[in-house]
Amino acid sequence: MLDLKQYEVWFITGSQHLYGPETLEQVAKHSQIIAAGLDQSSTIPVRVVFKPVLKTPDEIYNLVLEANAAKNCIGLVAWMHTFSPAKMWIAGLRSLQKPLAHLHTQFNSEIPWSEIDMDFMNLNQAAHGDREFGFIVSRMRLERKVIVGHWQDSEVHDRIAAWTRAAAAWHDAQGARFARFGDNMREVAVTEGDKVNAQMRLGYSVSGYGVGDLVRFVNEVSDADIDSTLQEYAEQYELAAGLQAGGEQHHSLREAARIELGLRYFLEHGNFKGFTTTFEDLHGLVQLPGLGPQRLMDRGYGFAGEGDWKTAALVRAMKVMSAGLNGGTSFMEDYTYHFGSNGMKVLGAHMLEICPSIAATKPRLEVHPLGIGGKADPVRMVFDAKTGPAVNASIVEMGNRLRLINSVVDAVETDQPLPKLPVARALWLPQPDLKTAAAAWIYAGGAHHTGFSFDLTSEHLADFAEIAGMEYLQIDRNTNVQQFKQELRWNDLYYHLAKGL
């Protein structure tokens, strides 16, 4: 499972020698206290590490090089306790390869009205010191997150936490490998894309494999490993009649376990962080992998169907961002609509592969026919998803840029039971309503595959898109279709011109 405590962000404070050793000692002391306070926050999932106060261009530049090379450092949190002339920061910021957050705070929460003097004023200058730093970062057109408020406020911790989760996902993507079994679902457009461009911009690589490469691992799975996995199934899930040992469909369950283990061994052997399958490339497999992808997603792997490598990478990023939370994150597809008088809703599902982390109750293992793929009836988990606020996101390629589209939704219970629907599913109300949300999504070119999460918010996704240099579009309760279309037009112009700015 994913553990974000292995990562750290460095808390860096800017000042200058002008203030003298006594003031600089106070700056360092205050910075250590703030860093320790953030590090001890139960909200922030990574370590926050104090670094010595930066007073010269060389100190700044060398610190940035150190951060770039540090494997566990996923970003910098900068603060100007005093005034730190920003030309000192140019060389360092120009070399920075890690995400940057700017914490606009001060050590004291209130003005000490009866005690304030010029010593206090000279020490506590973040109100204008951070403005100087903000200018140079904007002048250099560097992306960063600006967080304003007192460092002890819970809201500030929440905003830092969201950014650190996004930074962790970005860090995880650098050098990540994704396996694509078979190719794209034939003639589908949105799941295609420029994998070289994705590696250049997002850091991960996508490698294609014939299904025979997977089949070799599947065929090498031992009976003992299958027996052990079947015991896990019996402990974690309800088993439909016929799947228990000696049942008429027990062989299907053993085959599902064999495929799951083969997939897992392949991914572990190649150090992959996610994968795709497609029902059009199944030669040598008895079933379409269904239960295996469900359980592997639950372990933190990214997954998408039909060769959709962009969504598999997005699901992995969302899994990393949501590590340690308990709401759940899954691959998803907008499947069918309810245009009912009691609220227009979307029923989300897929052929088989929805992650059990979003299940409302204990999943049930069932075997049912699958009309595509031409293989034996596959095993899958069947369940209803949880309810509550969620995000439903897609990454698409627009030629000159990658676009992340986020639809904010509210998952609800189904109006009635679904006894004949043999797949896991989620039902939601898109914000502000289905007509507006669907129109905006279609105008934006959003895919039919998504990453769906109860753990993440729009802030996480916006932070991730900003770090990754992706266009970000949000569909929520404030969306107006005409204004959204204008935003699309403005963005087209911006991204056409931005490289020349």
UniProtKB/Swiss-Prot annotation:
Gene3D superfamilies assigned: 3.40.50.10940
Pfam families in UniProt: AraA_central, AraA_N, Arabinose_Iso_C
Catalytic activity of the protein: beta-L-arabinopyranose = L-ribulose
Cofactor: Mn(2+)
Gene Ontology MF terms in the entry: L-arabinose isomerase activity; manganese ion binding
Binding site for Mn(2+): E306, E333, H350, H449
Cofactor: binding comment: Binds 1 Mn(2+) ion per subunit.
GO biological process: L-arabinose catabolic process to xylulose 5-phosphate
CC terms in the record's Gene Ontology section: cytosol
Listed CDD domains: L-arabinose_isomerase (cd03557)
Listed pathway(s): Carbohydrate degradation; L-arabinose degradation via L-ribulose; D-xylulose 5-phosphate from L-arabinose (bacterial route): step 1/3
Keywords: Arabinose catabolism, Carbohydrate metabolism, Isomerase, Manganese, Metal-binding
SUPFAM superfamilies xref list: FucI/AraA C-terminal domain-like, FucI/AraA N-terminal and middle domains
EC number(s) per entry: 5.3.1.4
Stated role: Catalyzes the conversion of L-arabinose to L-ribulose.
Matching NCBIfam families: PRK02929.1
Family: Belongs to the arabinose isomerase family.
Name of the protein in question: L-arabinose isomerase
